[in-house]
Amino acid sequence: MGLLLLVLILTPSLAAYRHPDFPLLEKAQQLLQSTGSPYSTNCWLCTSSSTETPGTAYPASPREWTSIEAELHISYRWDPNLKGLMRPANSLLSMVKQDFPDIRQKPPIFGPIFTNINLMGIAPICVMAKRKNGTNVGTLPSTVCNVTFTVDSNQQTYQTYTHNQFRHQPRFPKPPNITFPQGTLLDKSSRFCQGRPSSCSTRNFWFRPADYNQCLQISNLSSTAEWVLLDQTRNSLFWENKTKGANQSQTPCVQVLAGMTIATSYLGISAVSEFFGTSLTPLFHFHISTCLKTQGAFYICGQSIHQCLPSNWTGTCTIGYVTPDIFIAPGNLSLPIPIYGNSQLPRVRRAIHFIPLLAGLGILAGTGTGIAGITKASLTYSQLSKEIANNIDTMAKALTTMQEQIDSLAAVVLQNRRGLDMLTAAQGGICLALDEKCCFWVNQSGKVQDNIRQLLNQASSLRERATQGWLNWEGTWKWFSWVLPLTGPLVSLLLLLLFGPCLLNLITQFVSSRLQAIKLQTNLSAGRHPRNIQESPF
């Protein structure tokens, strides 16, 4: 298959190797140990350097859809026709923002994190959004989805936003709703969903509507003892164990399904009010995007992997985990494989059978049909996927700081081009002359350099270890070039020390026996009897 190895580790005991520069390999090593795998010791652990297939995606189980937490990111813009109403509109805006649960002002990371990722197995749940002018994030084929929910927007349907601060209550669009294939939901209902989620408090009607509906069982994802339930009012999923009481695991404040449906809305939330004028007056528009708060979980959309879905997204997505392509080979195999593409070494012609890490752990790719519990495979995917998320966060932090540095520099350059302080001293300086806010240089180059230096040090350490370590085959051959001439004398001396005393004893006995025989033969020739020879003083 022409596998090119990026990192190669060989040790008599893999459990003895621990290094912070290899978090993914460390995690793989720990998983092999915890599962009692026969490959937990004395094996080669390899990662692929192929950029075409950086890893493999695995879908989350139905129960994980009810436990993985999402978060919302909000931005807004005022209506261009809004005049003379900024003060009351600002008051309304602050109240509405407080009523949204778990809102994050930190800019999310948009765009695919990985591409050309293949999904292994069948996703239990997929969410499809169809927007004419939406941002396409990728589309999963229907053949890999067990149940597909389609999101419909209600941008033209309004309802009252109840708040005690207003005499005439503002009106907002209704939240988006979802449709599902015929036969997906059974008539069986449960009151298990009522009163949930309870991990946060909010007055926002999109999350805590006044009219609670009973949840309906999703037949394709449920078993006799474990039900996966859908609350169509709040667009939320719940997992109920029928053998236990009602007091079970707490539901996240913002569920994955709720966050995905909200982010599909065109312009998020459009606020209109009656009490500012005689007719409905547009005030401001919300843009809401969603991200997965649970570390290690990603949105899988087609062959693209996302950490966040933008506002007004379109496509077909599921959630799951991403694992790197890590392979195992038994330690008794000779693998003279060049590291980092060293072309000076001879190429190995024979094929080597590599074992995927998950196969070494005794895990097979599961499907999304009828599995409500969290499986051993899901936990493994989650642990490996968390290490990838940590690496992404490190790179994102460095890039974000660099962007802040560029923004700060751009502000100073634009300001300096408008004038010089010495030319506008009579007017109080350039800021007063231009009637603008004063911009100052915010030097964050130290943070940028520290973040980049950390990444470069990790890469440099790995590269140095690959080129100077004892596993470097080129260096090994140079080492043998001066050791080989000394091998012959050293081996000869060792053999002489081991077998020399034995050989000397044998030679002494042989010489002594030959001398006795010669002496006996001489006496017989002289006519003496052996007895006389023995009694003779001579």
UniProtKB/Swiss-Prot annotation:
Task: Cite the record's note on assembly.
Answer: The surface and transmembrane proteins form a heterodimer. They are attached by non-covalent interactions or by a labile interchain disulfide bond.
List cystine links. 43-46, 43-439, 431-438
Highest taxon, organism lineage? Eukaryota
Annotated localization: Virion
According to UniProt, the name of this protein is Syncytin-2
List the source organism: Pan troglodytes (Chimpanzee)
The record's keywords, sorted A to Z, are: Cell membrane, Cleavage on pair of basic residues, Disulfide bond, ERV, Glycoprotein, Membrane, Signal, Transmembrane, Transmembrane helix, Transposable element, Viral envelope protein, Virion
PANTHER family registered for this protein in UniProt: SYNCYTIN-2, VIRAL ENVELOPE PROTEIN
Q: What InterPro entries has UniProt attached to this entry?
A: TLV/ENV_coat_polyprotein
Short motif CKS-17, span: 414-430
